[in-house]
Amino acid sequence: NKELTIRELISLIESKSINLRPPYQRNFIWTPKDQRLLIDSIYKGYPLPNFFILKNKDGKYEMVDGQQRATTIYKYYNNEFKDNRKKFFKEYAPDFFLDYRLNIVEIGNFDSSKGESKEVRSLCDERK
């Protein structure tokens, strides 16, 4: 296990070093209420469930579990919705949010072209 800050996650997303929607992932389905509750949890300092990511042989990552949360965080960072206080991200001093630490479980060196990542996704689903 390791930790990433939200700032580091955003950097991975923007550099296209992590794929939030590999082919086996469902579409983004969280409601606005779900999204606001997640952001509220971050501002309150509550721990979030682990994010599971695969590190492919090419050094890039795939989000196996945590796509809804990661997408919500990125959408909020880009001021696509307001939080429970009816404010956009840009209306706050950013450091508290960006320095929030996410727990990451990294599963290494898979070859997604062989479908191995889908097997890992199945295992993650079984543990829920």
Positions of the model-derived regions?
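Basic- and aromatic-enriched surface patches that contact anionic nucleotides/nucleic acids
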Residues: 1-9, 18-128
